[in-house]
């Protein structure tokens, strides 16, 4: 338990350290909270003279001033309460904003293998849910802790001033209260961590089903997804209820422990041998009863703090993840486009299986090279090593005769354009999607040229808002072919010296494909192009073709040379084109 507690203290200390820039604002809120507590405690002290001097002694001067005193006390309390609530919550919302920005910025710099290990649902849960838990720990918990504890201290001072003997009875149960809170604290921390994991699972299942809604419906997966979601939400509900039970039991025990000394005080105060004025008795009993609420709130704040610490631990764990290694110092404005692989092998971390083995080849600037092979042969992995989404396990990759690890990472990636069969677009305008990531002012004329070259202007001009049309999440408002043409226009606009085409025309109709292929041919004349090919008819004019099988480069040559070789490529070619005549025959019949 001590280890858990010390870890929690370190986490909370790191949380406070991360928010130290807001301490001046925070101190204003603290002063306001203390002022609120002092005014509440002061009002219980006023009960003694109100009864003794107002109702018993009938002090007319005191009675005359009493209404003004009460109004002033509550005016003071109202102003102090505004200061405390506003400034503490301002700090909390700033913390939420800062953490979300820090997490998002960090996520954009994490390596590809991190995303291989984590689902998007769990990451979204950290950004949204866990950060809010930290906000509660830094606002609600701090407000309650400081305000309630200062009120308890103020009430104890009032009780000592009124009757120190009666107050001692009350203090006897303090160690028991501390023990109950400590036991509840350990359990709440454990439960809070499990609740956050269950929320991440709920988010993951929901986001996955929403993104794949077409597949879910086409394959009748509604029942299966519903069962998964029901199970995840049930688990989350059970864990949340365990938190509620633990919190409620702890609060009830603390209230019971406080009620016992109140009963004892009432018993002794009413004994004839115990001399106490009516005002003193009313004041001390009022203080004791008033203390029930802040003590109850202090036991509840334990739940907030434990949730906040558990959430902060997950946030700091994410922020402590190593970002992509970028030790390169060479500048690379625009590459010529020469590419060389020298004995490159690759295996994922903690995996014994080799994905690529001893791959060697070189590409001259301006060449078009196709990569073919069966599914799982390593085609995509081979390409992913080039912009350093992954680093080769052994061997060297060069661009323009220089090891790619020597270049600054972003400058290296600026040399590539990508058009994939799995098109990625953003919930933004067509114009911003085409010009995505390009710094500086956007030249609309060049965007139109790129869109026209990609044959995208044909449908863009028919849209009411043209290039300013917002296309929805991943371009949901466009057809598959239209989305693909936007992606091609984006690559044309970037005009990078090296282009990666992953079956770039797969979503286009035959008419559009001819025009796009012509545009891509013009682009290939000016840059080096790597084509991951599934349809072999699209790569017959490649300068040369490499064939991968189980991570090894087994054949290399032009289309005609590989057909003459009558090896793996020729077999793939015959398989594809044997289907085409059969399909045409069926159509003729």
From Swiss-Prot:
Pfam families with a match to the protein in the record: ABC_membrane, ABC_tran
Residues given in the record as ATP binding sites: 373-380
Residue pairs linked by disulfide bridges in the UniProt entry: none
Compartmental location: Cell inner membrane
Annotated Gene Ontology cellular component terms: plasma membrane
Membrane-spanning parts: 23-43, 60-80, 153-173, 249-269, 272-292
GO biological process, one term: transmembrane transport
Broad class of the protein's primary localization: membrane
Keywords tagged on the record: ATP-binding, Cell inner membrane, Cell membrane, Lipid transport, Membrane, Nucleotide-binding, Translocase, Transmembrane, Transmembrane helix, Transport
E.C. number: 7.5.2.6
Membrane topology annotation: Multi-pass membrane protein
Domain ABC transmembrane type-1: 27-307
Keyword DNA-binding carried by entry: no
Molecular-function GO terms, alphabetical: ABC-type transporter activity; ATP binding; ATP hydrolysis activity; ATPase-coupled lipid transmembrane transporter activity
Catalytic reaction(s) noted: ATP + H2O + lipid A-core oligosaccharideSide 1 = ADP + phosphate + lipid A-core oligosaccharideSide 2
ABC transporter domain sequence ranges: 339-575
Keyword Hydrolase: no
Assembly information from the UniProt record: Homodimer.
Family: Belongs to the ABC transporter superfamily. Lipid exporter (TC 3.A.1.106) family.
Record comment regarding domains: In MsbA the ATP-binding domain (NBD) and the transmembrane domain (TMD) are fused.
Name of the featured protein: ATP-dependent lipid A-core flippase
Record gene name: msbA
